[in-house]
């Protein structure tokens, strides 16, 4: 099988010739640039500056030589711009605090404050506001909360203005975007045999990475995360109006995207909203069913009616109690499958595969990234990876990836042990 054939078999719940692997096809299956740099060195690959494909999380580009070294089966059709609001071109050097040499898009503008924190300007515009901060010694960015005071929750809901507050956050794609997607999708589809993940984005309803308005130069309304979650109970019509607007824009963008890429992609990235904590849900099931599920169903239904793509849905945490609702809303591929949160509440890999293996393609869950991968021994990594692959890869419906992105400071030996266990062969 080619990589593309292998992934197509897996996402259609057919047994592939061996377990498919994803390293870096999107912003939830990647690797911090510092770790990419060290892994390349450990594998004897060229040492060079790495482009940051996703600068918010500081994810390093997974180039062809590394894709081949670990036998990864997917590549991402990324957007021309990034979630920091500037284009992925005009690359300029940017060294991480640990010395890792990277390139970042030319629109990146930042200052260093008195504490040594890197303060990033919104959309590269020094006349606007700081939107992101990387603490001194850090390896990724955090959003900046621009509202010092809690939102006044004593207001009448009819006095709120959700459409005005959020009009700058959701934008219909441009003709230039469409031309880029068409050209890049043709290059990836015709020039490689990798499966292709369309990293469109835009349907992360209530995603904590976007609620503060990092790409809005003058964010308004309910933006502090604690206020936003409280508003689900106090102002549900406000939340629903925001989601209605976001969904309407997403459906327009999906139409543009389909015209641009056709059937050259196999999976489309839909949402990265986290609904789970380490111990349970952020909200009740009824709240999810009322405010979120109808919108996700509308988006997933459009994809299934109009394309042959599978939909990719990311949610960290213990989401055991949402699995049935996610299935009913049309989710195909579930990521990152955080067993470190799900298993203590009764959802083991075996039970998940038995009860939901015919419904979802599980995309991740290959090794615990909170404890085993960063702090375990290579033998402990091998043991857990072997068990997860044995259970989850039965009958297809599985793409190997750790639980979420691999962060900085993970030992290279553990990463090599991880990939060698999946492949059943040495990679160096």
Where are these regions (language model features)?
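Active-site loop segments of alpha/beta catalytic cores
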Residues: 1-41, 45-53, 62, 138-428
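Generic detector of intrinsically disordered, low-complexity, polar/charged segments
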Residues: 21-27, 41, 57, 73, ...
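Short, surface-exposed beta-strand/loop "edge" segments at domain boundaries and coil↔beta transitions
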Residues: 28-31, 85-86, 126-132, 205-206
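Segments that shape or occlude catalytic/ligand-binding pockets
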Residues: 36, 40-85, 92
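Short, charge-rich binding segments
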Residues: 65-69, 101-102, 111, 187-191
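Non-catalytic, alpha-helical, charged scaffold/linker segments
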Residues: 89-143, 162, 168-169
